[in-house]
Amino acid sequence: MKQCWVDLSCWNKDLATVALEAGVDAIVVDDAAKVNVLAKVTTIAPNGDLIPGKDVSMVTIVDKASEEACLEKAKLGPVIVSTGDWTVIPLENLVAQSDRIFAAVGSVEEARLALTILEQGVAGVVLMTTDPEVIRTVAAMVRGAGAKVPLVPFTLTVVRQLGMGDRVCIDTCSILADGEGMLVGNTSSAFFLVHAETIENLYVAPRPFRVNAGAVHAYVLTPGNRTAYLADLRAGDLVTVTAADGGTEEVIIGRLKIEKRPLLLVEGEAGGVKAGLVLQNAETIRLVGLDGKARSVVDLKPGDQVLGMVAEGGRHFGYAVKEQICEQ
């Protein structure tokens, strides 16, 4: 989960308000109390949540020795890195060896570059700016800076009715768009892209904040390439929204709705990997076709193709593990 911090060591209440309203993850300040009276947010300060020099290090890269010192500090916690003339190569070297590097940046362009270095990017950016628009733009950029996932076409092999069971609707705190949804599966090795309820229907109004994700036992993709059981999710948890082009975004769960409904089983195959998912049997539940458009489960049949993801199977508390695990 990439983060956006703002450096307000030179205190500016108006900029602090902008940063808070933009949803930044933390603020660097000389006195945490200045921020705490405005809103609840992580502070990096001598009296803050994270203490400079103890919980967070700050390093200016000037040569190879300072790079090596930075990597040593990164073993202990986050490191805010400045590169003087803002050159890319030192950051590339650091990002290749640590996932705790935060880049000090002064513009949207610098932030974009830092977030995409070596494709994976830095862990976060620390904005050194007095421009409120830069804060707003970069904060929004970071929220949408999830890595792309490799979606593949699954050819359906089974679509059949089941009995009644408990299914989970994930109501998020975001408005999702057409072509967006969540990756959900019966196993941790393969997922279908389940479309959000953004489509107009004769019988019910759209619920663009909602994904009717499947039965309680299913896995859903969450930030950090982790998974969670649908039944274990709670308000305030983060889940990953995936678009038809593979782009991802982290969103907050506002509510879970678990209700008994008629279910159906959808199974498919991609490159020899089998995927399956138990979903509610209703017109408003949709997977995503290869064209990025929603396909209602009531219209699906064997031979149809939908988007999904193949993953490394085997999970322990949501983390991928290199272990022989058979799920079927």
UniProtKB/Swiss-Prot annotation:
It comes from the Archaea. InterPro entries: DHQ_synth. This is 3-dehydroquinate synthase. GO terms for biological process: amino acid biosynthetic process; aromatic amino acid family biosynthetic process. Keywords: Amino-acid biosynthesis, Aromatic amino acid biosynthesis, NAD, Oxidoreductase. NCBIfam families: PRK02290.1-5. Its EC number is 1.4.1.24. Catalyzes the oxidative deamination and cyclization of 2-amino-3,7-dideoxy-D-threo-hept-6-ulosonic acid (ADH) to yield 3-dehydroquinate (DHQ), which is fed into the canonical shikimic pathway of aromatic amino acid biosynthesis. Belongs to the archaeal-type DHQ synthase family. Transmembrane segments: none annotated. The keyword Amino-acid biosynthesis applies. HAMAP family: Arch_DHQ_synthase (MF_01244). One of its GO terms (molecular function) is dehydroquinate synthase activity. The keyword Oxidoreductase applies. The lineage of its organism: Archaea, Methanobacteriati, Methanobacteriota, Stenosarchaea group, Methanomicrobia. It catalyses: 2-amino-2,3,7-trideoxy-D-lyxo-hept-6-ulosonate + NAD(+) + H2O = 3-dehydroquinate + NH4(+) + NADH + H(+).
